[in-house]
Amino acid sequence: MANRRQSLIILILYFIIYALPSLLVASFHNLGSQVFVIQTVDYLVGAVLLVIVASRMHEPNPLEKHPVSWVKALLWGLLGTVLVIVGQMVILQLTQLLGHSTASANTTTLLTVGRQYPFFFLAIMVGAPIMEELVFRKVIFGNLAPLTGQIGAALISSVFFSFAHADGHFILYAFIGLLFCWLYRQTGRIQTSMLAHILMNSVVILPTLLGK
């Protein structure tokens, strides 16, 4: 498995970055709204750190050996955004038809916080998508593909991605994860799935931000 050291560092940093705000809240009970400032800075700095570590991966994984041009990567990212939004609409509609709730506790909580502290949206629109693509697509999917095959690696990566969100909509997040794996595989550039992920989150967040 290529780039084991960098991959391990990315995974460790990711867990530290995501755990840090909770650890601080548990240790300092009087942080109040400052925790959202801390979390925003934490995610943005964390994204930069993970990008730096990923850039040290000198040997491309099998998915990255024949990358498309940057123009094609951009177009694939835009197409992926449309596909993931349409796919979400279809899955949520089917969920409703089956009599299950389509409400997302995760999304509702994030939007509620963002309405009070708009700067927090930077963490969700930029920091989180960049880190998640590096962890779930580049590291997990990219490194497992030679061992389990691309389909097996995509399924494993997407299951982890869905569990990480702990939202109750397992199939929805697994679908999103699989689509981002597909974009990464099609282009050989992790930036493609990053773009689609950032735009997907932005479509949800911007109406709330602009309507504030």
Task: Annotate the PLM regions.
Residues 32-40, 104-110, 178, 182:
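Non-cytosolic membrane-interface motifs at loop->transmembrane helix junctions
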Residues 26, 30-31, 55-62, 92, ...:
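Transmembrane helix-loop junctions in multipass membrane proteins, especially transporters and channels
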Residues 51-61, 183-187:
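Structural signal for the C-terminal ends of transmembrane alpha-helices
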Residues 11-19, 40-48, 77-85, 89, ...:
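Alpha-helical transmembrane spans of integral membrane proteins, capturing the lipid-embedded, hydrophobic core
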Residues 21, 47-54, 87-91, 132, ...:
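Alpha-helical transmembrane segments of polytopic integral membrane proteins
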Residues 3-57:
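Alpha-helical transmembrane segments in multi-pass membrane proteins
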Residues 116-212:
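Transmembrane helix-loop-helix hairpins at the membrane interface
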Residues 31, 61-128, 146:
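Juxtamembrane helix-loop-helix connectors linking adjacent transmembrane helices
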